[in-house]
């Protein structure tokens, strides 16, 4: 039976970067990955580098290796460097980039919107090629001599306690085998399947299951790859706002239409309504679906303490939905530091936990209240959302990608009109006063 210092389940950015950082510290590690080829995206992902200052505890910058081309993009083959201002890591990314400069949240019938942008229009995010980036990280893993086992599922993990380490039971192409490691890093993504076998998901609040389908479409009228748009109102067919943003690498001229449903509102039905019956149906008269991706995400409250015994859970596996690529890289660096200390008999996992809790916004106890900023539909009627968004006319909010900062900004701007709302629309004011208990699960269960 093979024995390692560290076993890592999952070859996403967090797992790969953990291995890279560990190998540079002289640790013997192995990565177990269920996919055959990580350079091919089989599950939908937004693929953005977020540039907001102190977004999830860090400010990311990108040293772009070329000027924008005639299409307003950074071309394929460009050497770029992604940098963490707060934690100090640098990672090279060779590939295309497309800037995101404006975000619009539209009310019913496109009458009003919440607009996020910087005055000089500098980007608050870059669309990148995640599949290519993962392959580049894997190339580093292989160059460092780290063992990488693909097409393999870890179906059970057992913490043997103390110095005995962890026993992993795996299967590849119908053949079962076992291995041992002194420490285990669970980096399998939002499904957190290994954590589940260890009972580490017990006690996490379950919010909802989101069925997400993305349609990459050519020929969408009015589409701008530098814009990210959300459409709020039942007239658009969904309780959860349809989103439209930048298409995939190599096809930034395609729109990325994202529809989030649940068993009572399946994505295909939402697609048909949005593209054929909604106020924006005219945009799709000559559009063509070029490619589709989907995923199912179970939204759980984050793990406040993401370790147990010899097992550390990192990245999306411990998060509320996702940490984004940059957050996963941070987790990878912290994990490597923690593992080195743990193997030296020091409390590295405690230090990781402290950093985890302080860094990611979703660990704030007020997260449920922030969620309510997005629970507009069906709590508010379409007409009431139109009224609320009308209060934002002639207002441009700071450029923001954050799913936590954006609703705060929007509601702060709306609350500047509290006296007006109370006078003009007592019905809306009553709902605002009672909104705190509304969450995403309310929107997605109706």
For the regions a protein language model found, what residue spans apply to each?
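FAD/FMN-dependent oxidoreductases across multiple families
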Residues: 125, 263-335, 342-354, 358
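N-terminal Rossmann-like FAD-binding beta1-loop-alpha1 element of flavoenzymes
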Residues: 3-31
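Predominantly flavin-linked oxidoreductase catalytic cores and closely associated redox partners
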Residues: 140-280, 319
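Conserved acidic E/D residue at the C-terminus of a beta-strand in Rossmann-like folds
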Residues: 31-36, 316
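N-terminal FAD cofactor-binding segment of flavoenzymes
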Residues: 21, 25, 34-104
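Short beta-strand to alpha-helix junction loop
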Residues: 118-140, 193, 264-269
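Active-site-proximal substrate-binding core of FAD-dependent oxidoreductases
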Residues: 337-384
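C-terminal auxiliary extensions adjacent to catalytic cores
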Residues: 376-446
